[in-house]
Every structure is written in C-alpha cells, then in structure tokens.
Amino acid sequence: MNPFVSPCEFTRRDVLCVAAACAAGLLTGGPAQATEAPAFEIVDPPQVISWKPPLYHGWPTLARRKNGELLLVWSGGRESHVCPFGRVEFMISPDDGRTWSWPQVLLDGPIDDRDAGVVETADGSILVTTFTSLDYQPMLEQAEKLQPGQPGAWEPLRLREWQAVQRRISAEQRQAELGTWMTRSTDGGVTWSARYATPVNSPHGPIQLADGRLLYCGVELWKPEHRVGVCQSTDDGLTWDWLATMPIRPGDDSTEYHELHAVETASGKLVAHIRNHNPVNAQETLQTESTDGGKTWTTPHSIGVWGLPSHLLCLRDGRLLMSYGHRRPPRGNQVRVSSDAGQTWSEPILLTTDAYSGDMGYPSSVECEDGTLVTVWYERLKDSPLAQLRQTRWRLKG
C-alpha cells in the first residue's frame, strides 16, 4: 500500500484526473499503440489460499526459487487496511502453489509492518522487504474523541486493543520505528536475520541482475527528500548503495511517484514501472528504461495502462509480463505482455473481473517449469471486510 495515498476508492476526482490524462495523451501523441493480447487459458480458477480467514491479509509478493519452490510474503495478522497490527508473514509451496506451508511470522514490530516483497539472490539467499507506518494513529486519535453511542464510536474492545498497542512504546520510540526494512535468510527460509534498514522501499522489493548485482527501485519513505531512485547491492543484499535518482517528467511532482518495480530484459536493458498520482496520466503506470545498468534512466512516460502497481517478470521466451490491479470496472487483476522489451504492451488479459471492492490487487506472477503461470494477489471478498490472499494458475497460449 502506498502510505501517502488514500486506499482503493475510485472517486469523482479520479475521474477528472483520468479525463485530463486522456486529453493530454491526445495532444502529445500518447503511448504506442497496444498490440493484440495473446490467447490464454485458466488452468486453476481463483481460490483463497489464506490459512487464517478471520484476519486481514494485504499486499503480497510471489517469487520462485531456482529449486522450484514458490515463496509468498505479505502483511498479515491485520484487523483492516490501516491498523497497528500488521506483521510480515511468509510461506512456501513445494508444488507450484498447489499446497502451501503454514505461515511463519518474520517481522512483528511495535507499529504496523506493511507491504512485503521477496526475491531469491544468485547466491541462494532470500531477501524480504517491508516498511513500517504510523498511518493508523489519526484514526485512533479520532476514535478517542468520541463517546460510546455517538455516531462512529468504536466498540470498547477495539478501542482498548488499539490503545494497548500505543502503550507498548513511547511516542518518540514509535517515530524511531518508522523505516524501510529488509530481513535475510541463507538457509532457505528456516532462520532469518534481524531486520536492517534499506535506502528505499517498494511493494515487491529488489531484483537480481545477470551481472550479480541486486537492484532496488523505490522511494525514500519518511524522509524530507522523498527521493525516487535506484539502489544496488554487491554483497548479496547485506548493504545497499544509492545508484541513481530517477528523472521527473516535466510538470510532475516526484512525491506523486510511488511503488516502483523493475525487470531486466534478455538484452540487459532495465525497465521500471512507477505508480503515478500526478494529474496527467493519474492512476496509470509510467515506464522508464536504463541501458547502462541503472546508472541513468529515461524520463518516465505513459504506456497507456490504467491500473497499478505493476509487477514485472521476464518470461523464459524473453517476453515481459506486467501484472497489476484494475480498481474500476471490470474490477480485478490484469496482465499485459511485451514482445519488444517494453517498447509496446499488449491489450490486457483479464485474469479476474469479479472483485467486490477496490480493496484488492498488488498481483505478482511467476513462471513454473511446465510453462504455467501462477499469480497471487489480495482481495476483500463480498462476505467479509477481511481481505484474503487469492491465487490462480494460468497459461499463455500464444
């Protein structure tokens, strides 16, 4: 979840922003024409894979290890989209998502642990990322002003639980807990390091490059500069150095760039996607590219895709796959394919169109040995306010 953007709902303001974006596209020529979407088939229909439905699950990331295991991380143990109870959870599938292990809690600090990313490094280590947030505090402060029986007043137990969280540490200590974090396992996820700070955060975390480096495109959270850029690690994720600051499109505000993810193409070119909340191309995914290993990047530009945030994957045949949430009708999860290293993208493939609300998305995808694709996302279902993890298995036919 982007900590600077109110969650999920598509408002009248959004409609006006999208209309402005469309007008701007007509004036400037807009993105390249989309190509026809390849044929696909659903192998296994969407299903809930959460082990604990009475709790809220959000913002997952799926990755595949070299040994074929699937890794899934998310923010679990939650009461709602914004609350103080979030913790980073992790589970493994040995059979391409057909079965999953019982969740393991990796991080559970005194404030909210949110969106989780995961990657396996070239050395076989597993890196998991997250960020911490105090966005729940204004909600608690407002609730404490209301008397029982007043409109909007909380149930007494809920109020006591939130207040108990606040009493764990002081206000100064809570501020010190804000940060962007990583934890690391070198034994396949059995044991984990203490968390350590990273310069940036993005929901799906860093990527492994062919030259051995790890690349992390993201945003500096909780810092005045709020830089949008790229960090690299040359020691298996132990330490991170700032590599480049992303250029800003003329007229844009960099604080409206969020939730980046990148992929290395077969040629070595890097493609990164950005969640955009500027008035032009609002709620769209912007794209930027690098041909020098991430040292410099092109000015972000529209690719004509409404929906966010994007997760990128390079398929074995060299094509790129972007997966993203679509929070207006047809509400659900979509993917697009690029056969030319991101120069153009196909029309959308509609993986799901049955989402009950905008509290959903953040899909990520992996390619299995047999060529099938597994996509996992989070979604608030019709019969409960507690969002769950959902999964589908599918295949490109062309």
Regions found by a protein language model. Give the residues of each.
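N-terminal secretory signal peptides
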Residues: 1-10, 17-25
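Short, cationic motifs built from Arg/Lys/His that form the positively charged side of catalytic pockets
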Residues: 12-13, 92
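Generic detector of low-complexity/intrinsically disordered segments
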Residues: 6, 18, 28-29, 211, ...
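Asp-box/BNR beta-propeller blade signature and adjacent active/binding-site loops
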Residues: 35-398
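Positively charged, low-complexity intrinsically disordered regions
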Residues: 13-14, 115
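Bacterial Sec-dependent signal peptides at the C-terminal "C-region" and cleavage site
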Residues: 26-37
